[in-house]
Swiss-Prot record:
Name by which UniProt lists this protein: Fructose-1,6-bisphosphatase class 1
Residue sites binding Mg(2+) 1 per the record: 97, 119, 121
CDD domains: FBPase
PANTHER family documented for this protein: FRUCTOSE-1,6-BISPHOSPHATASE-RELATED, SEDOHEPTULOSE-1,7-BISPHOSPHATASE, CHLOROPLASTIC
Swiss-Prot/TrEMBL cofactor(s): Mg(2+)
Length: 342
């Protein structure tokens, strides 16, 4: 069997090669990513054994800071990433979906120059149904003085300033999609050697797509403008080919499919509940990293009002937003229907 050259390039080798291209590089980012990837491998191992082990599936019967029922794997993934990253020596502060406040580097450990905002296990409500889930992360350089404890302001930066962003998809295989501001690369975990291998170099999102991803169960709660858009892309008037609806309910899985196949993902605000008037997705560790990846792959990401996601400066750790992300021409078509911001 012939082997393509890229299929022998590990993530570690890839990061070192990229580091060598930058004369000012210190190796800190490469080391930080090594710790993050190690944690992802541990989580992947537990996800793959979820149906075989006790105390892995199901909920903890507790509610996290987001008001969501915390799944057992949620808590496990959170502990793994927190422990690994805060003790890496390259992080100054961590923001996690599972914690109301920021997570500091423990006493006795070196404080680094990077911040990470992370959703340790996105789509966790799908765990028991064996649906693909994922980890989403965003990396920034700190703004506060070096060697001092990181602050919340170090995390609250525009998405356009991200040093890196990515996600790990725990599906039929475990895949890491990484963007460091110079394109998007995909790595698949080879269980035989325990390494992420470059499997999808220079990933590009198709300019158009025939798939839309949205929870149509909330149709009656959307604005008229969003309803009109959905009716338009489903219309067969004039011989138009309607788009196909594909909604998994896991942001990582829905986004990943559209990254490969082309399409659009929408999470608008609605009137179903007064709890999330500005949308439900978190800006720092869901919308911003996905927007960074989408734009680097040739796509677009905006709010339901047409604001570029990467231009938004978060005002709080768990700030929420609407999200429309996907193929460039599909998002541009949505903008023709976008409501005006109140």
């Amino acid at each position: 069997m012939s082997v393509h050259p890229t299929q022998t390039l590990s993530l570690s080798q890839y990061l070192i090669e990229e580091q060598l291209k930058l004369p000012q590089a210190t190796g800190d980012f490469t080391a930080l990513m090594s710790h993050l990837v190690y944690a992802a491998k541990i989580v992947s191992r537990e996800v793959r054994k979820a149906g075989l082990l006790e105390n892995v599936l199901g909920s903890n019967e507790t509610v996290n800071v987001q008001g969501e029922t915390q799944m057992k794997l949620d808590e496990y993934a959170d502990k793994v990433f927190n422990h690994t990253l805060t003790r890496s020596g390259h992080l100054c502060i961590l923001g996690s979906e599972e914690h109301e406040e920021t997570v500091s580097v423990p006493s006795g450990y070196k404080i680094g120059k990077y911040t990470i905002a992370i959703d340790p296990l996105d789509g966790s409500s799908n765990i028991d149904a064996n649906v693909s889930i994922g980890t989403i992360f965003s990396v920034h350089l700190r703004k506060s003085p070096a060697d001092t404890p990181g602050t919340l302001s170090d995390l609250l930066q525009k998405g356009s300033g991200q040093r890196a962003a990515g996600y790990v998809l725990y599906g039929s295989s475990t895949m890491l999609v990484l963007c460091t501001g110079k394109g998007v690369s995909g790595f698949t975990l080879d269980p035989s050697c325990g390494e992420f291998i470059l499997s999808h170099p220079d990933m590009q999102m198709p300019e158009t797509g025939g798939i839309y991803s949205i929870n149509e169960g909330n149709y009656n709660y959307w604005s008229d403008e969003v309803k009109n858009y959905i009716r338009d892309i489903k219309s067969i008037e004039g011989g138009k080919k309607p788009q196909s609806g594909r909604y998994i309910g896991s942001l990582v899985a829905d986004f990943h499919r559209n990254l490969l196949k082309g399409g659009i993902f929408l999470y608008p605000n609605d009137t179903k509940s007064t709890k999330y008037p500005n949308g439900k997705l978190r800006l720092l560790y869901e919308a911003a990293p996905m927007a960074f990846i989408a734009e680097q792959a040739g796509g677009m990401a905006v709010t339901v009002y047409g604001e570029r996601i990467l231009d938004l400066t978060p005002k709080e750790l768990h700030e929420r937003t609407t999200l429309v992300v996907g193929s460039k021409k599909e998002v541009e078509h949505f903008l023709k229907f976008a409501p005006k911001k109140p």
